[in-house]
């Protein structure tokens, strides 16, 4: 998994988002790998003291406990598990119809194809216990195993996995039980008057009493038996249910209970059971909590799931990215976050699989796949190999984000003297391509400096440029862009082994030679049978270099090492091949070379199409003659380079005239003499539907924002009436728009969509905020009620936010997945035509 930096140690921290360079204020998620320094940091965080010290000298004591609400915060103990787990889980292919033959077949495949790349765990999920998939009443019986597993036994299965050099994991919902005989005889379960169960939930027909004298022996005995069978990874499910029930059912408990509010009491009783589990499995076993985000176990788990179960396809990706971003502030700080599994199998589109893989690879969260690996085509196996294993990535952003679908994820890496950024640029629209500015200044980079630009997944070098670049991303896909500052010498840009591009594989790196004949040398761990490519960026200008020769040698006793190389305009590659995994020493010598230069000419014209109040798409005819890029300027300020014939410009104030120019560029930095020019004035319409505007941010954990439709794709419908215009959200959501103070009123109707699926009461409160202040708030609205009209004064408001909050009924779980609608929502302009 590459090196692990010392922990706990003081780390840089960002306490709030900043402008992305295009007007959006919460569009970039920043993570770090290594001892990174960045101008984006607002200060530093001391994890042992739980203290933030800001750059201006402010001190925030008990930061995680008080500011972030993590009651039981303590820094993650990384002494035994220095990085998150990487492996495979049975659930999302086999569900409860799992059998040992399939587990072993996948384990063999992992040992041969993915273990060399860092996979370690094989985790058996639900279906091994009681009666497996037959009969819900036996799903929580831990006293027996399903007939499919009785011949080999759990111990035999674990032995088969361990014989392949892998670790065996197992799922269990240990606080519950479905076997009445066990529940009665053990004397450790909650009973109500009349000799009936006091708690029947998903966790089981019966719930263990944490105060019963025999409870530690009962619970510890289950885990000791599994640990004695050589399971070393334990996934315990339904944990938020347990906490809730323990706080709610104290009157049925045998022994004394702590004093306090039900939630606090439930947490303390629950933590008591976790200590019993930890005592049984030991510190050398990995303990993962599951079901929601059970913060009550911080400090006792190694890791925790941070959201609900994923689903296959694009909705699964949206759920994964929201979960990853929402809880990333806990990852590798208080525990290892687990956003659920990675799925890449067809018929999922290749782009969808690439997005999902990138989310996992750039955040370093727990990495468990859940396909029938034997069936994966080579292209999907390749995706897995480039993100395995999980690495020591840690968040810079230590705050609760308002936008959990940020389209840019920036991983800042510092390793062996290399400081570089690996940036994921995501398109969350599965139907339309996107074009987005990646601004150097928004990433905390020097906007006047040259940076080599490399596309990792496509293996494409785009040159070295200043200011920023415009990135085209296909529908429902991602571009992973590596940025390395250009110098007067050749610089290593990328290695092909892992998405972190050097952290996992590169062991040593040094520059040598002279100014006219420079050299690079290093050591890399190369996996047998996996071609290993080093990509080197060459200096930009009238003179540069090419490879004169390259060499590589392997370890003593290793297989022969073969090396090949090529030189190109602006970059060069060296590829190393060997049949056995070994550390390879390599060297590259360069010689002077003159790059080819073409006298570029600019487009003859440019046009602009409005895409929002302050956004527009520039486009121009594709040049017949060669060019390397197009430089876009706005009001005399260079913004970035476009590689295609369009650029999306955002954040320009409406009602003001702006000067736009596009100039063709060559790879050496030479520019066309003249630029194509355009004057553009974004206008303020008399009225505009919210559904016609591009949101500044969208926060909801599931589904995509519905535009003129409900969140799950059906027609907008409230109280039996359908609406043609509006946006569909979930019952826990925030959608923000920048409106520049240009409008006087918001007119709309609101309500819970008729597509609510639950039988239980669905209720929510709708709210309109302007620049963070509440402007209007509804009463509690229920499913089936008619839409409620809204008319709100938004004069002078720059940022408008539409909020929906679910109303939780007593003794029911919180549900944030009901569809909620903003119907016929439109903005009416100020009487003067502009609030600017």
Where on the chain are the PLM-derived regions?
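Aromatic- and carboxylate-enriched substrate-binding clefts and catalytic-loop regions
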Residues: 1-4, 8-16, 20-27, 121-348, ...
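Carbohydrate-recognition beta-sandwich/jelly-roll modules
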Residues: 1-121, 146, 233
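Active-site-proximal substrate-binding groove within the catalytic cores of carbohydrate-active enzymes
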Residues: 18-23, 33, 38-55, 86-89, ...
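C-terminal beta-strand-rich structural cap/linker in extracellular carbohydrate-active enzymes
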Residues: 463-503, 568-594
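Short, flexible loop/turn segments at beta-strand junctions in immunoglobulin-like
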Residues: 471-473, 576-578, 649-654, 739, ...
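Pro/Thr/Ser/Gly-rich low-complexity, intrinsically disordered linker/stalk tracts
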Residues: 595-625, 654, 672-683
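Gly-Asp-aromatic-enriched flexible segments
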Residues: 601, 606, 642, 676, ...
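Beta-strand-rich modules
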Residues: 649-668
